[in-house]
Amino acid sequence: MNSQDLKKRQEKIRNFSIIAHIDHGKSTLADRILEKTETVSSREMQAQLLDSMDLERERGITIKLNAIELNYTAKDGETYIFHLIDTPGHVDFTYEVSRSLAACEGAILVVDAAQGIEAQTLANVYLALDNDLEILPVINKIDLPAADPERVRHEVEDVIGLDASEAVLASAKAGIGIEEILEQIVEKVPAPTGDVDAPLQALIFDSVYDAYRGVILQVRIVNGIVKPGDKIQMMSNGKTFDVTEVGIFTPKAVGRDFLATGDVGYVAASIKTVADTRVGDTVTLANNPAKEALHGYKQMNPMVFAGIYPIESNKYNDLREALEKLQLNDASLQFEPETSQALGFGFRCGFLGLLHMDVIQERLEREFNIDLIMTAPSVVYHVHTTDEDMIEVSNPSEFPDPTRVAFIEEPYVKAQIMVPQEFVGAVMELSQRKRGDFVTMDYIDDNRVNVIYQIPLAEIVFDFFDKLKSSTRGYASFDYDMSEYRRSQLVKMDILLNGDKVDALSFIVHKEFAYERGKIIVEKLKKIIPRQQFEVPIQAAIGQKIVARSDIKALRKNVLAKCYGGDVSRKRKLLEKQKAGKKRMKAIGSVEVPQEAFLSVLSMDDDTKK
């Protein structure tokens, strides 16, 4: 094709993604669009087709983004090339969403006709507006008995400020309104800008590892053209590779002769090392490089840290390889080696949030067959020492000695909680118990309220989300952004077993709640740790001060069983001998700590402050 033909083809390309809150019907709508454009035959069709990970189907959530090419013949008789880029809806995967939106010109905003706008919808709409996307509102699930499309239309206009007069009323499940959506994409989403004759600039928005072909890049071509045989160069590190294959996904990979400006597809170039390709990097041609890299993504910093250790210590290298492979297409996962006296060798990993941590743990156990122990999650604290230094600490066992600490700052988040009016009291009570500060409250409509609080991230990491769902019968939706660091009265609590500190059980706690949290953990551990041949004291300590203690009683063998009557001094002698043996055993005996003990630091069900 000459450049004139390519420019004509470019005018027919439409790149868009679908954004929605969890369960508002995003994956179902994607399925219908694939059926309507006959991209997938009815034989191959299955629910949530784009959610290819088992985990995604089971949990009914989208974790990874996917990019698919479809052909659509519009009412004007022209055939258009659509690239549908599927995005996750959950707060922990906002990074994935921002990546997929950077590869688009338009976004379909799906809102449930019964539930209306949720906190997550807002967060993703703001991301789309930041990327200057054309937003097409779609009110989905209009066939539900509780649907109220007009109310939702007003919500979209009032809360988000979008013109919803032409919003498509649809039901993805019943296939209503799908054609209107496709026509709106043709009319309203702009064709990609960019120059096919300019030097190649392609944005990497994802990558997968293939055992035979190496790292396969998923790219959006912004300028120029790429074809097999080209020598490409990464703009961040200057490394060069020879392109062996380019193509598109329909969801299956299909090879093509070239990828030109506006296309979304994959590039294979025998890239062997995972570290050479960063998501957000720009690919260009080695013999005709672009002047500057594209504006990539904002690097997401992990907000939650936890230790991951293999239960079998010989699996340490397997765990490292598994983490490297996951990091390849999950750029927000960070890890570094760490050792613990209690757990041996493992990694300190950084995650975007608790769901992200859960998903990574499940993927490690499922896809790589590694049994893991996870320590309690913690956040990044700023510890200011008496020497006027500031240390960032994400691992409680690295906290400096209390005598060296001048003050500690902890991260606060701005939490947006959308909730029906009847539960506002419960939400405010929960937020206050979690040391939250009330900011403001807006009414979205007669019944729904948007409550905003500043809450310490450490409190959200624990079990805030579960508690929020249970106290609002599942009606609340929740989204948070990092806000600032604030000074707090925090202390490090150590747990001692038999007089020895167990580093993996240490945690940071607010001074006010230290005593009760210590008491609960000590009691919990007493139930979990099996009885030994000798008595084991469990203590919770802040610095040198013991704040709570409980003892696991020893198992006792009856050494007097063989004495039938007889002299009391004989019995005493046997008991003294047993006592001496226990004493010796206690001095050298170590206590086995089961996996549940590490998790008990996490779940504080019977905690009064929770």
Swiss-Prot record:
Which Cys pairs are S-S linked?
Answer: none
Q: Is the Nucleotide-binding keyword given for this protein?
A: yes
Top-level lineage group: Bacteria
Q: What is its EC number?
A: 3.6.5.n1
Q: Which PROSITE patterns match?
A: G_TR_1, G_TR_2
Family assignment from sequence similarity: Belongs to the TRAFAC class translation factor GTPase superfamily. Classic translation factor GTPase family. LepA subfamily.
Name of the protein in its database record: Elongation factor 4
Q: Provide the gene name from the record.
A: lepA
